[in-house]
Regions:
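TPR/TPR-like (Sel1-like) alpha-helical repeat modules
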Residues: 77, 94-117, 130
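Alpha-helical segment of the N-proximal tetratricopeptide repeat
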Residues: 12-43
Length: 132
C-alpha cells in the first residue's frame, strides 16, 4: 500500500513539474519545446485537462487551429471532464462560423460549471456566452 501511495505522489509531482515547465516554456514563447513537454504530460496524465488545454494553446499560438480543435475534442473523449477545452473549442468553432457547434460546446461547459458550482468556470462560460 505504501508503495502505491509513493508511486502516486511521485506521479503527481511529475505531472505538476511537466505542467510548470511547459507553462514556463509557453510564457517564454518557446512553443516547440512546450509542445514536447505537454505531449509528455498528456501521455503520463491523459485525464488531466490542463495538458490538453495547454497543448491546444501551443498549437493556437502557431496558428494551427485545426490541430488545436482536434486536441480539444480528443480531450473530451479521454479526460473525465473538460469544460475549459470545451470553451476553447467553442472559441475556434465560432471563429470558423460554426455558431451552433460553438453554442453546444459552451453549454457542455455550463453544465459542468453548474454541477460543480465552480464560480471561476461559470465566469468563463458567461464570457463565452456574451461572445457567442
Amino acid at each position: 500500500m505504501f508503495q502505491t501511495q509513493s508511486r502516486r505522489a511521485t506521479s503527481t509531482r511529475a505531472v505538476e513539474a511537466l505542467y510548470a515547465t511547459g507553462h514556463w516554456l509557453l510564457s517564454q514563447e518557446r512553443i516547440a519545446q512546450a509542445i514536447v513537454v505537454f505531449r509528455a504530460m498528456i501521455h503520463v496524465a491523459p485525464h488531466d485537462e490542463r495538458g490538453w488545454l495547454a497543448l491546444g494553446a501551443c498549437h493556437e499560438a502557431r496558428e494551427q487551429h485545426s490541430i488545436a480543435l482536434e486536441l480539444y475534442g480528443a480531450a473530451s473523449e479521454v479526460a473525465r471532464s473538460t469544460p475549459r477545452c470545451d470553451l476553447a473549442r467553442a472559441r475556434i468553432l465560432r471563429s470558423r462560423g460554426q455558431s451552433q457547434e460553438a453554442i453546444d460546446a459552451i453549454e457542455q461547459a455550463a453544465l459542468v460549471a453548474e454541477r460543480t458550482k465552480d464560480e471561476d468556470l461559470q465566469s468563463l462560460v458567461d464570457a463565452e456566452r456574451r461572445r457567442a
